[in-house]
Amino acid sequence: MPNNEILICGAGIAGPALAYWLRRGGFAVTIVERAPAPRPGGQTVDLRGAGRTVIERMGLMDRARAESVDQRGFALVDTAGRTTARLPADSFGGEGIVSEIEILRGDLARLLYEATLPDTEYLFDDTVTGIDQDADAVTVTFERAAPRRFALVVGADGPHSVVRGLAFGPERDFVHPIDLYTTWFTAFDDLDLDGWFVMHNAPGGLVVSARPGRLPGEIKAGFSFRSPPLAHDRRDVAAQQELVARRFAHVGWEAPRLLRAMRTASDFFFDSMGQVHLDSWSRGRVALLGDAGYCATPLTGLGTSLALVGAYVLAGELAAAGGDHALALRRYDTVMRPYVSQAQQLPPGGAAGFAPSSRLGIRLRDLSMRSMTRWPVRNLFAAQFAKAGDVALPEYGPASAGAEQ
Protein backbone atom coordinates (compact mmCIF):
# COMPACT_ATOMS: atom_id res chain seq x y z
CA MET A 1 0.00 0.00 0.00
CA PRO A 2 1.43 3.44 -0.91
CA ASN A 3 2.12 5.60 2.12
CA ASN A 4 0.19 8.54 0.70
CA GLU A 5 -3.37 7.19 0.84
CA ILE A 6 -5.52 9.18 3.27
CA LEU A 7 -9.13 8.59 4.33
CA ILE A 8 -11.27 11.55 5.39
CA CYS A 9 -14.56 10.90 7.18
CA GLY A 10 -17.01 13.73 6.43
CA ALA A 11 -17.91 15.60 3.23
CA GLY A 12 -19.08 18.87 4.76
CA ILE A 13 -16.69 21.82 4.70
CA ALA A 14 -13.58 20.62 6.56
CA GLY A 15 -13.27 17.29 4.72
CA PRO A 16 -13.33 18.51 1.10
CA ALA A 17 -11.17 21.52 2.02
CA LEU A 18 -8.57 19.12 3.39
CA ALA A 19 -8.87 16.93 0.29
CA TYR A 20 -8.20 19.94 -1.94
CA TRP A 21 -4.90 20.77 -0.25
CA LEU A 22 -3.86 17.13 0.18
CA ARG A 23 -4.24 16.49 -3.55
CA ARG A 24 -2.05 19.51 -4.29
CA GLY A 25 0.50 17.96 -1.96
CA GLY A 26 0.51 14.69 -3.91
CA PHE A 27 -1.66 12.54 -1.64
CA ALA A 28 -4.35 10.10 -2.77
CA VAL A 29 -7.59 10.96 -0.98
CA THR A 30 -10.81 9.10 -0.25
CA ILE A 31 -13.76 10.78 1.50
CA VAL A 32 -16.51 8.71 3.12
CA GLU A 33 -19.82 10.39 3.93
CA ARG A 34 -22.89 8.96 5.65
CA ALA A 35 -25.33 11.05 3.58
CA PRO A 36 -26.33 9.61 0.18
CA ALA A 37 -25.20 12.79 -1.63
CA PRO A 38 -23.77 16.23 -0.87
CA ARG A 39 -26.14 17.96 1.53
CA PRO A 40 -27.72 21.11 0.05
CA GLY A 41 -29.03 24.19 1.83
CA GLY A 42 -28.45 24.55 5.54
CA GLN A 43 -27.96 27.77 7.44
CA THR A 44 -25.65 30.60 6.46
CA VAL A 45 -22.01 30.50 7.53
CA ASP A 46 -19.45 33.27 7.64
CA LEU A 47 -16.39 33.63 5.44
CA ARG A 48 -14.19 35.84 7.55
CA GLY A 49 -10.59 36.36 8.62
CA ALA A 50 -8.12 33.58 7.91
CA GLY A 51 -10.90 31.31 6.63
CA ARG A 52 -11.60 33.79 3.87
CA THR A 53 -7.88 33.89 3.08
CA VAL A 54 -7.88 30.10 2.63
CA ILE A 55 -10.80 30.34 0.18
CA GLU A 56 -8.89 33.05 -1.71
CA ARG A 57 -5.81 30.80 -1.92
CA MET A 58 -8.02 28.06 -3.33
CA GLY A 59 -9.16 30.41 -6.08
CA LEU A 60 -12.79 30.07 -5.01
CA MET A 61 -13.52 33.56 -3.71
CA ASP A 62 -15.26 34.85 -6.83
CA ARG A 63 -17.59 31.86 -6.84
CA ALA A 64 -18.22 32.20 -3.11
CA ARG A 65 -19.16 35.86 -3.56
CA ALA A 66 -21.51 34.92 -6.39
CA GLU A 67 -23.23 32.38 -4.12
CA SER A 68 -23.37 34.66 -1.08
CA VAL A 69 -26.57 35.76 0.64
CA ASP A 70 -27.17 39.50 0.69
CA GLN A 71 -27.94 40.57 4.25
CA ARG A 72 -28.13 44.14 5.52
CA GLY A 73 -27.12 43.27 9.06
CA PHE A 74 -28.39 41.98 12.40
CA ALA A 75 -31.50 43.31 14.19
CA LEU A 76 -33.23 42.60 17.50
CA VAL A 77 -37.01 42.96 17.72
CA ASP A 78 -39.59 42.89 20.51
CA THR A 79 -42.82 40.89 20.68
CA ALA A 80 -44.58 43.31 18.34
CA GLY A 81 -41.74 43.25 15.81
CA ARG A 82 -40.40 46.69 16.72
CA THR A 83 -36.63 47.01 16.28
CA THR A 84 -34.78 47.44 19.57
CA ALA A 85 -31.21 47.31 18.23
CA ARG A 86 -29.41 47.03 14.89
CA LEU A 87 -25.89 46.27 13.73
CA PRO A 88 -25.36 46.90 9.98
CA ALA A 89 -23.28 44.41 8.02
CA ASP A 90 -20.51 46.93 7.41
CA SER A 91 -19.90 47.37 11.15
CA PHE A 92 -16.45 46.28 12.35
CA GLY A 93 -15.14 46.38 8.80
CA GLY A 94 -17.57 43.72 7.59
CA GLU A 95 -16.46 41.30 10.32
CA GLY A 96 -19.38 41.76 12.74
CA ILE A 97 -22.27 39.43 13.65
CA VAL A 98 -23.21 39.42 9.96
CA SER A 99 -19.99 39.30 7.96
CA GLU A 100 -19.28 40.74 4.53
CA ILE A 101 -19.64 37.30 2.95
CA GLU A 102 -22.43 35.03 4.20
CA ILE A 103 -22.99 31.82 2.27
CA LEU A 104 -25.28 28.85 2.80
CA ARG A 105 -23.39 25.95 4.33
CA GLY A 106 -24.55 23.63 1.56
CA ASP A 107 -23.43 26.06 -1.15
CA LEU A 108 -19.94 26.35 0.31
CA ALA A 109 -19.75 22.57 0.71
CA ARG A 110 -20.81 22.17 -2.93
CA LEU A 111 -18.08 24.55 -4.14
CA LEU A 112 -15.50 22.52 -2.24
CA TYR A 113 -16.97 19.23 -3.47
CA GLU A 114 -16.87 20.38 -7.10
CA ALA A 115 -13.30 21.63 -6.68
CA THR A 116 -12.17 18.19 -5.44
CA LEU A 117 -14.40 15.84 -7.44
CA PRO A 118 -12.03 15.31 -10.41
CA ASP A 119 -9.25 13.78 -8.31
CA THR A 120 -10.87 12.65 -5.04
CA GLU A 121 -12.68 9.37 -4.43
CA TYR A 122 -16.06 9.85 -2.71
CA LEU A 123 -17.91 7.06 -0.90
CA PHE A 124 -21.43 8.32 -0.16
CA ASP A 125 -24.09 6.51 1.87
CA ASP A 126 -21.41 4.82 3.98
CA THR A 127 -19.55 5.29 7.24
CA VAL A 128 -16.60 3.96 9.21
CA THR A 129 -17.38 1.13 11.63
CA GLY A 130 -13.90 0.08 12.77
CA ILE A 131 -10.36 1.44 13.00
CA ASP A 132 -7.38 -0.84 13.67
CA GLN A 133 -3.90 0.70 13.67
CA ASP A 134 -0.51 -0.93 13.37
CA ALA A 135 2.96 0.50 12.84
CA ASP A 136 2.51 0.92 9.10
CA ALA A 137 -1.12 1.83 8.41
CA VAL A 138 -4.73 1.90 9.55
CA THR A 139 -7.16 -0.85 8.61
CA VAL A 140 -10.63 0.64 8.24
CA THR A 141 -13.89 -1.27 8.06
CA PHE A 142 -16.98 0.33 6.55
CA GLU A 143 -20.70 -0.24 6.84
CA ARG A 144 -20.94 -0.98 3.11
CA ALA A 145 -17.55 -0.90 1.38
CA ALA A 146 -14.90 -3.58 1.78
CA PRO A 147 -12.15 -3.05 4.39
CA ARG A 148 -9.16 -0.99 3.25
CA ARG A 149 -5.83 0.21 4.58
CA PHE A 150 -4.75 3.85 4.70
CA ALA A 151 -1.65 5.69 5.82
CA LEU A 152 -3.79 8.14 7.79
CA VAL A 153 -7.43 8.59 8.80
CA VAL A 154 -8.89 12.05 9.47
CA GLY A 155 -12.17 12.57 11.28
CA ALA A 156 -13.89 15.64 9.84
CA ASP A 157 -17.33 14.37 10.78
CA GLY A 158 -18.60 16.98 13.21
CA PRO A 159 -19.04 17.26 16.97
CA HIS A 160 -20.62 13.78 17.18
CA SER A 161 -17.65 12.31 15.31
CA VAL A 162 -17.70 8.57 14.63
CA VAL A 163 -13.93 8.57 14.08
CA ARG A 164 -13.31 10.26 17.42
CA GLY A 165 -15.53 7.72 19.16
CA LEU A 166 -13.65 4.79 17.61
CA ALA A 167 -10.10 6.08 18.07
CA PHE A 168 -10.24 8.40 21.10
CA GLY A 169 -13.15 7.40 23.32
CA PRO A 170 -16.77 8.20 24.18
CA GLU A 171 -18.32 11.55 23.33
CA ARG A 172 -18.96 12.45 26.97
CA ASP A 173 -15.19 12.71 27.54
CA PHE A 174 -14.71 15.45 24.94
CA VAL A 175 -17.98 17.30 24.29
CA HIS A 176 -18.78 19.97 26.88
CA PRO A 177 -22.39 21.26 26.69
CA ILE A 178 -23.08 24.96 27.14
CA ASP A 179 -26.70 24.21 28.15
CA LEU A 180 -28.15 25.53 24.92
CA TYR A 181 -30.26 23.70 22.33
CA THR A 182 -31.00 24.90 18.83
CA THR A 183 -32.96 23.96 15.75
CA TRP A 184 -32.53 25.25 12.20
CA PHE A 185 -34.72 24.79 9.16
CA THR A 186 -35.75 26.43 5.90
CA ALA A 187 -39.16 28.06 5.57
CA PHE A 188 -40.85 29.52 2.51
CA ASP A 189 -42.93 32.47 3.62
CA ASP A 190 -43.74 36.07 2.77
CA LEU A 191 -42.34 37.26 6.10
CA ASP A 192 -40.75 40.62 5.30
CA LEU A 193 -37.28 40.73 6.84
CA ASP A 194 -36.17 43.61 4.62
CA GLY A 195 -32.79 41.92 4.18
CA TRP A 196 -32.02 41.72 7.91
CA PHE A 197 -31.04 38.79 10.12
CA VAL A 198 -33.73 39.27 12.79
CA MET A 199 -33.76 37.81 16.30
CA HIS A 200 -36.37 37.93 19.05
CA ASN A 201 -35.77 36.97 22.69
CA ALA A 202 -38.40 35.86 25.18
CA PRO A 203 -38.04 35.27 28.94
CA GLY A 204 -36.89 31.80 29.88
CA GLY A 205 -33.85 31.82 27.62
CA LEU A 206 -35.88 31.52 24.39
CA VAL A 207 -34.66 32.78 21.01
CA VAL A 208 -36.47 32.97 17.65
CA SER A 209 -34.47 33.93 14.57
CA ALA A 210 -35.06 34.41 10.87
CA ARG A 211 -32.74 35.53 8.12
CA PRO A 212 -33.07 35.79 4.34
CA GLY A 213 -32.11 32.82 2.21
CA ARG A 214 -30.68 33.05 -1.29
CA LEU A 215 -33.97 32.36 -3.09
CA PRO A 216 -37.03 34.64 -3.16
CA GLY A 217 -39.31 33.88 -0.21
CA GLU A 218 -36.72 31.61 1.40
CA ILE A 219 -36.15 32.09 5.14
CA LYS A 220 -33.52 30.43 7.28
CA ALA A 221 -35.28 30.09 10.62
CA GLY A 222 -34.22 28.93 14.04
CA PHE A 223 -35.35 28.35 17.60
CA SER A 224 -32.90 28.15 20.50
CA PHE A 225 -33.43 27.65 24.22
CA ARG A 226 -31.34 27.29 27.33
CA SER A 227 -31.66 24.02 29.20
CA PRO A 228 -29.58 21.51 31.14
CA PRO A 229 -28.80 18.35 29.13
CA LEU A 230 -31.96 16.65 27.88
CA ALA A 231 -32.52 12.99 27.13
CA HIS A 232 -33.63 12.96 23.50
CA ASP A 233 -33.32 10.69 20.48
CA ARG A 234 -31.26 12.50 17.84
CA ARG A 235 -33.09 10.51 15.14
CA ASP A 236 -36.67 11.18 16.29
CA VAL A 237 -37.56 14.35 14.36
CA ALA A 238 -41.23 14.33 15.39
CA ALA A 239 -40.34 14.24 19.08
CA GLN A 240 -37.80 17.02 18.62
CA GLN A 241 -40.33 19.21 16.84
CA GLU A 242 -42.88 18.61 19.58
CA LEU A 243 -40.30 19.59 22.21
CA VAL A 244 -39.58 22.85 20.38
CA ALA A 245 -43.29 23.56 19.83
CA ARG A 246 -44.02 23.18 23.55
CA ARG A 247 -41.14 25.45 24.54
CA PHE A 248 -42.21 28.23 22.18
CA ALA A 249 -46.00 27.84 22.37
CA HIS A 250 -46.52 31.22 24.03
CA VAL A 251 -43.72 33.23 22.40
CA GLY A 252 -44.64 36.29 20.35
CA TRP A 253 -43.27 38.00 17.25
CA GLU A 254 -43.38 35.51 14.33
CA ALA A 255 -42.89 32.38 16.45
CA PRO A 256 -46.35 30.88 15.66
CA ARG A 257 -45.95 31.05 11.87
CA LEU A 258 -42.37 29.77 12.05
CA LEU A 259 -43.47 26.87 14.27
CA ARG A 260 -46.04 25.95 11.61
CA ALA A 261 -43.33 26.09 8.94
CA MET A 262 -41.05 23.94 11.09
CA ARG A 263 -43.51 21.03 10.96
CA THR A 264 -43.15 20.69 7.18
CA ALA A 265 -39.48 21.64 6.78
CA SER A 266 -37.44 19.11 4.81
CA ASP A 267 -34.12 20.11 6.39
CA PHE A 268 -35.06 20.28 10.08
CA PHE A 269 -32.03 20.00 12.34
CA PHE A 270 -31.99 19.85 16.15
CA ASP A 271 -29.03 19.48 18.48
CA SER A 272 -27.42 20.66 21.67
CA MET A 273 -24.60 23.18 21.51
CA GLY A 274 -21.31 22.11 23.00
CA GLN A 275 -17.60 22.65 22.63
CA VAL A 276 -15.15 19.87 21.81
CA HIS A 277 -11.91 19.85 23.80
CA LEU A 278 -9.02 17.39 23.44
CA ASP A 279 -5.47 17.56 24.74
CA SER A 280 -4.29 16.13 21.41
CA TRP A 281 -6.03 16.00 18.04
CA SER A 282 -4.22 12.85 16.97
CA ARG A 283 -3.93 9.29 18.18
CA GLY A 284 -1.30 7.43 16.21
CA ARG A 285 -2.37 7.56 12.56
CA VAL A 286 -5.79 9.04 13.29
CA ALA A 287 -6.34 12.82 13.40
CA LEU A 288 -9.31 15.12 13.99
CA LEU A 289 -10.23 18.23 12.05
CA GLY A 290 -12.78 21.01 12.52
CA ASP A 291 -15.79 20.41 14.77
CA ALA A 292 -14.72 16.82 15.39
CA GLY A 293 -11.62 18.06 17.20
CA TYR A 294 -12.33 21.62 18.30
CA CYS A 295 -15.95 22.69 17.84
CA ALA A 296 -16.34 26.23 19.16
CA THR A 297 -20.19 26.36 18.89
CA PRO A 298 -22.13 28.60 16.48
CA LEU A 299 -22.14 31.38 19.09
CA THR A 300 -18.56 32.25 18.15
CA GLY A 301 -19.19 32.50 14.40
CA LEU A 302 -15.79 30.88 13.86
CA GLY A 303 -16.59 27.26 13.03
CA THR A 304 -16.10 27.70 9.29
CA SER A 305 -12.82 29.56 9.74
CA LEU A 306 -11.53 26.85 12.08
CA ALA A 307 -12.46 24.15 9.56
CA LEU A 308 -10.85 25.89 6.58
CA VAL A 309 -7.70 26.97 8.40
CA GLY A 310 -7.32 23.57 10.07
CA ALA A 311 -7.61 21.82 6.70
CA TYR A 312 -5.00 24.11 5.14
CA VAL A 313 -2.55 23.66 8.02
CA LEU A 314 -2.99 19.88 8.37
CA ALA A 315 -2.47 19.28 4.65
CA GLY A 316 0.47 21.67 4.54
CA GLU A 317 2.22 20.03 7.47
CA LEU A 318 1.69 16.54 6.03
CA ALA A 319 3.22 17.64 2.73
CA ALA A 320 6.13 19.39 4.46
CA ALA A 321 6.93 16.41 6.70
CA GLY A 322 7.89 14.15 3.81
CA GLY A 323 6.00 11.11 5.07
CA ASP A 324 6.65 11.59 8.79
CA HIS A 325 3.03 11.71 9.93
CA ALA A 326 3.96 12.00 13.61
CA LEU A 327 5.99 15.15 12.96
CA ALA A 328 3.22 16.60 10.79
CA LEU A 329 0.55 16.01 13.42
CA ARG A 330 2.69 17.61 16.13
CA ARG A 331 3.22 20.65 13.93
CA TYR A 332 -0.51 20.80 13.14
CA ASP A 333 -1.22 21.00 16.85
CA THR A 334 1.48 23.62 17.43
CA VAL A 335 0.18 25.93 14.71
CA MET A 336 -3.54 25.49 15.42
CA ARG A 337 -3.69 25.28 19.22
CA PRO A 338 -3.40 29.04 19.97
CA TYR A 339 -5.92 29.88 17.25
CA VAL A 340 -8.39 27.30 18.53
CA SER A 341 -7.97 28.39 22.15
CA GLN A 342 -8.83 31.97 21.22
CA ALA A 343 -11.74 30.95 18.99
CA GLN A 344 -13.32 28.80 21.69
CA GLN A 345 -13.71 31.74 24.05
CA LEU A 346 -17.42 32.56 23.84
CA PRO A 347 -18.56 36.12 23.09
CA PRO A 348 -19.24 38.42 26.05
CA GLY A 349 -22.08 36.96 28.09
CA GLY A 350 -21.86 33.51 26.50
CA ALA A 351 -25.10 31.52 26.35
CA ALA A 352 -26.74 33.86 28.89
CA GLY A 353 -25.95 36.87 26.70
CA PHE A 354 -27.39 35.16 23.65
CA ALA A 355 -30.51 33.91 25.45
CA PRO A 356 -31.20 35.97 28.60
CA SER A 357 -33.58 34.39 31.10
CA SER A 358 -35.44 37.50 32.30
CA ARG A 359 -37.05 40.57 30.77
CA LEU A 360 -34.46 42.70 32.55
CA GLY A 361 -31.68 40.59 31.06
CA ILE A 362 -33.17 41.04 27.59
CA ARG A 363 -33.36 44.82 28.02
CA LEU A 364 -29.76 44.99 29.24
CA ARG A 365 -28.56 42.83 26.33
CA ASP A 366 -30.44 45.08 23.88
CA LEU A 367 -28.77 48.09 25.49
CA SER A 368 -25.35 46.51 25.00
CA MET A 369 -26.22 45.86 21.35
CA ARG A 370 -27.16 49.49 20.82
CA SER A 371 -23.82 50.45 22.36
CA MET A 372 -21.79 47.90 20.42
CA THR A 373 -20.23 50.39 18.03
CA ARG A 374 -19.32 52.81 20.83
CA TRP A 375 -16.47 52.69 23.35
CA PRO A 376 -15.97 50.76 25.63
CA VAL A 377 -18.41 48.07 24.45
CA ARG A 378 -16.99 48.27 20.94
CA ASN A 379 -13.58 47.12 22.15
CA LEU A 380 -15.04 43.98 23.77
CA PHE A 381 -16.81 42.86 20.61
CA ALA A 382 -14.03 43.99 18.28
CA ALA A 383 -11.71 41.58 20.10
CA GLN A 384 -14.20 38.75 19.55
CA PHE A 385 -14.64 39.47 15.84
CA ALA A 386 -10.87 39.85 15.34
CA LYS A 387 -10.28 36.25 16.42
CA ALA A 388 -11.17 35.02 12.92
CA GLY A 389 -7.90 36.42 11.60
CA ASP A 390 -5.81 35.76 14.69
CA VAL A 391 -3.46 33.24 13.07
CA ALA A 392 -0.49 33.61 10.75
CA LEU A 393 -1.09 31.19 7.88
CA PRO A 394 2.18 29.44 7.04
CA GLU A 395 3.40 29.20 3.47
CA TYR A 396 3.77 25.57 2.44
CA GLY A 397 5.50 26.02 -0.91
CA PRO A 398 3.78 25.93 -4.31
CA ALA A 399 0.74 24.09 -2.94
CA SER A 400 -0.16 27.12 -0.81
CA ALA A 401 -0.81 29.28 -3.84
CA GLY A 402 -3.95 27.49 -4.98
CA ALA A 403 -5.39 27.81 -8.44
CA GLU A 404 -8.38 29.42 -10.04
CA GLN A 405 -11.17 26.92 -10.47
Provide a role label for each language-model segment.
Residues V175-L180, D194-F197, D236, W253-F270:
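A short coil-to-beta-strand element that immediately follows conserved catalytic motifs
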Residues A66-E67, E121, H250-S266, H325-R330:
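Acidic/histidine metal-binding catalytic segments
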Residues F185, W196-L230, F248:
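Active-site substrate-recognition segment that forms the wall
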Residues D62, D189-G195, L230-A231, E254, ...:
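Short helix-loop capping/hinge motifs at secondary-structure junctions, enriched
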